[in-house]
């Protein structure tokens, strides 16, 4: 919402300033109204009203403003601009396009109070109508298509708060987002641009049970702990365990139609990496640039704290907008802990009663409000779309018992626990298979059986059983050593090692291994399973375990991930393993 566009009223003055929290007196405002604070017009939002005193959280640095400066009310809630131009763009936490602000300022250093619309108002888009005069449309119905990027067709919808009616006028050609393209008998006119309050979920008909996986291209996620399209997942882990790289991998290779990446309070150089890498990378499903399906929201750790609180809502509102068009959207929030810390700071400045570890008592409610906006929905126009929410959590010291992790755990259905010990051993992605879980496995099995292989659930369960047995045996090994174990248990440890090194480990920086299709994931585990079965046959025939594990073909299991022509490689490898083991007896 641009300051220049709003009919702002100078109807209040600053009473006090405490960091990002400003109190004003004489301000005629409602909860969540957007206001402009001080002579420079810093954007803020009303968060508390008591008698004649209004409390505002300011989304910019407040140094230098003081008492009796004006506070102007817009009378509108914090909203985002929705329309063509959202993709291939980078925003700050309140949807100001950073590249446009840089051009406006002539400098990468932005002044306070500078503003710009969320989508460019002067750009003309080719509008192709999908309705004719005389057709009847309701709220949410599609009236036309705009080619937003080479990957995504932007569907122009009747806004959800419109009554609808008979189409009286339809235009075709190039228009700006504010020009009317369709007129209705109700007197309403449809433009390509909509506004929507960020804290209000967009309406749907029904939330449905997800049945299709969000294929990530990461073997451990797709194979052992899958997330559904419309699912929720948390990635908690200590510093340096790989949360951000895992989020980047999901943003690059997840088979969603649209990616919304929210950098919430994390390091600036990590967002820089995204901005540098994504334009050069190809979307594996279309071959087009990744940025053509991506919108970035950057609110790094050196940006104002209050804007962290809004950036997550900005991201999920944009995600819901594309969901209404029938697209599958994946939202990455990195990290929800920084969002919670922003809530804690503002709560403490408001002198609210603190909850556990100083977080506000409403922490669980806010987290639930965010994650519950994810899901697989039937939209009001009859299409189906999904929003998958994947939030990184940064518990101090890797302590999963802290409030943000525990409250997130109660809400999400997929838990990918990152492990500092695995990261120190250079096992990446460092997802601990003993602590992680997915509650979507059973409902996604029919999809994997239909689209990959019938015995997908059995192969997954076999891998889980071997890894569980290894965890139990490791405790004995640490006490008495590996050589003291019986031969069959030594062989189990060797099979588990191949599972860890060739199935669970994956090199995010290798051009081939960075992405693994479900078919390749399945064939990898079947190759290790065959080695297991043939090796135990040889062991039963009296072959010493040392000879079994030292065959030449076995180490080639660790090279499956980097093979481009993996089907032929795995078929040859299976034959060689069988031949070499049978030669031993």
UniProtKB/Swiss-Prot annotation:
Keywords: ATP synthesis, ATP-binding, Cell membrane, Hydrogen ion transport, Ion transport, Membrane, Nucleotide-binding, Translocase, Transport. Its EC number is 7.1.2.2. NCBIfam families: ATP_syn_A_arch, PRK04192.1. Has multiple subunits with at least A(3), B(3), C, D, E, F, H, I and proteolipid K(x). Pfam families: ATP-synt_ab, ATP-synt_ab_N, ATP-synt_ab_Xtn, ATP-synt_VA_C. Belongs to the ATPase alpha/beta chains family. Residues 196-211 have a biased composition (Basic and acidic residues). One of its GO terms (molecular function) is proton-transporting ATP synthase activity, rotational mechanism. This is A-type ATP synthase subunit A. Component of the A-type ATP synthase that produces ATP from ADP in the presence of a proton gradient across the membrane. The A chain is the catalytic subunit. One of its GO terms (cellular component) is proton-transporting two-sector ATPase complex, catalytic domain.
């Amino acid at each position: 919402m641009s300051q220049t566009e709003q009919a702002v009223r100078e109807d209040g003055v600053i009473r006090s300033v405490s960091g990002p929290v400003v109190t004003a007196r004489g301000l005629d405002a409602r909860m969540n109204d957007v206001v402009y604070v001080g002579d420079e017009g810093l954007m803020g939002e009303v968060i508390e009203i008591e008698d004649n005193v209004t409390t505002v959280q300011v989304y910019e640095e407040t140094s230098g403003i003081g008492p009796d400066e004006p506070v102007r009310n817009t009378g509108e809630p914090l909203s985002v601009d929705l329309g063509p131009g959202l993709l291939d763009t980078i925003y700050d936490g309140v949807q100001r396009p950073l590249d446009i602000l840089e051009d406006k300022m002539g400098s990468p250093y932005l002044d306070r109070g500078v503003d710009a619309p969320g989508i460019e108002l002067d750009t003309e888009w080719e509008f192709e109508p999908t309705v004719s005069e005389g057709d009847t449309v309701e709220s949410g119905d599609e009236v036309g298509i705009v080619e937003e990027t080479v990957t995504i067709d932007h569907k122009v919808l009747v806004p959800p708060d419109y009554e609808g009616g008979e189409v009286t006028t339809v235009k075709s050609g190039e228009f700006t987002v504010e020009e009317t393209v369709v007129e209705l008998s109700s007197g309403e006119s449809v433009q390509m641009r909509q506004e929507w309050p960020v804290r209000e979920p967009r309406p749907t008909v029904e939330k449905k049970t997800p049945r299709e996986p969000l294929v990530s291209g990461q073997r451990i996620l797709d194979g052992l702990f899958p997330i559904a399209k419309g699912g929720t997942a948390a990635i908690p882990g200590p510093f340096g365990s790989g949360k951000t790289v895992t989020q980047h991998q999901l943003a690059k290779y997840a088979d969603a139609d649209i990616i919304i990446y929210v950098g919430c309070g994390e390091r600036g150089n990590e967002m820089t990496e995204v901005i540098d890498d994504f334009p050069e990378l190809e979307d594996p499903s279309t071959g087009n640039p990744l940025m053509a399906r991506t919108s970035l929201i950057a609110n790094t750790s050196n940006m104002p704290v209050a804007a962290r609180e809004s950036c997550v809502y900005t991201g999920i509102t944009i995600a819901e907008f594309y969901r209404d068009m029938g697209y599958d959207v994946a939202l990455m929030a990195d990290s929800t802990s920084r969002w919670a810390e922003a809530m804690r700071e503002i709560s403490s400045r408001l002198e609210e009663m603190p909850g556990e570890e100083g977080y506000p008592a409403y922490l669980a409610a806010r987290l639930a409000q965010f994650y519950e906006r994810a899901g697989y929905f039937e939209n009001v126009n009859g299409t189906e779309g999904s929003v998958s929410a994947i939030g990184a959590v940064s518990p101090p010291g890797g302590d999963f018992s802290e409030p943000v992790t525990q409250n997130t755990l109660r809400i999400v259905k997929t838990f990918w626990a990152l492990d500092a010990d695995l990261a120190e051993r250079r096992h990446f992605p460092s997802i601990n298979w003993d602590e992680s879980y997915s509650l979507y496995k059973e409902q996604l099995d029919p999809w994997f059986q239909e689209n990959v292989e019938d015995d997908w659930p059995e192969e997954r369960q076999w891998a889980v059983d071997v890894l569980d047995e290894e965890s139990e045996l490791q405790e004995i090994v640490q006490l008495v050593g590996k050589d003291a174990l019986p031969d069959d248990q030594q062989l189990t440890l060797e099979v588990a090692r191949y599972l860890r090194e060739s199935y669970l480990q994956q090199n995010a920086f290798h051009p081939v291994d960075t992405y693994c299709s479900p078919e390749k994931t399945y064939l990898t585990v079947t190759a290790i399973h065959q080695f297991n079965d043939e090796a135990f046959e040889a062991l039963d025939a009296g072959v010493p375990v040392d000879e079994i594990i030292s065959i030449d073909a076995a180490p080639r299991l660790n090279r499956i991930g980097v093979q481009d022509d993996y089907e032929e490689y795995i078929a040859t490898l299976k034959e060689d393993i069988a031949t070499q083991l049978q030669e031993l007896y």
